[in-house]
Amino acid sequence: VHLGFATYDMKLPAGQRQTNSVHIYIAVDELLELCRKLTSGEMRHRLAQMRKSEEKAPLYKCLGGTSAEKLQRIGRARSDGKSLSRTAELHCGKNADFLFVANSGPGETNKTGLIVPRFGNNPENHVAVSMSWDCFSGFMLTTKAHYEAWLAAWYTRQAEKPVQKKQEAPARVETPAETKYDDMSMF
């Protein structure tokens, strides 16, 4: 699932207002798990626990990005030669229920292929969106509904594709041994 986070400065001229942009890719299974936690009450319970204990860890964290090699291959290499790290975090909010944060900046690809952020507390792009419980729930469940509709349409298209005609099996050819024993009963 592709989520686009952006900030805008309305004082700038039209067409130049976007000041930060971070594209986050969340695996479908992770999105569905977040939706399950929302609908089951697990996330509301966890949110209450975190508020009570003043825990600062994110409720959800997604690490991603594009390797330096791929950036080079597609003609978008960074000037520092590093990978592009993208992170998304869902935090317990102070002024609203949630704070959904997306960051991007330099990263390094580790041995397993994970792109590890190397921007510390200073990302090149930072977008934070405060969301109420209802707003976040609506956003997640609407995204889930759209994914399910897309999946149903995909299956429908697959079912409508013409079936390839099966090749006819070659005619059975009798061997001399078969004709010799055709008249004999087995028992």
Walk through the language-model features, giving the residues of each:
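Short glycine-rich, low-complexity/disordered patches
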Residues: 40-68, 149-175
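Compact, well-ordered interaction domains used in eukaryotic information-processing assemblies
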Residues: 11-44, 52
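Terminal targeting/leader modules
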Residues: 4, 19-21, 69-71, 155
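A cross-kingdom feature marking solvent-exposed beta-strand/loop segments within repeated
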Residues: 7-27, 114-129
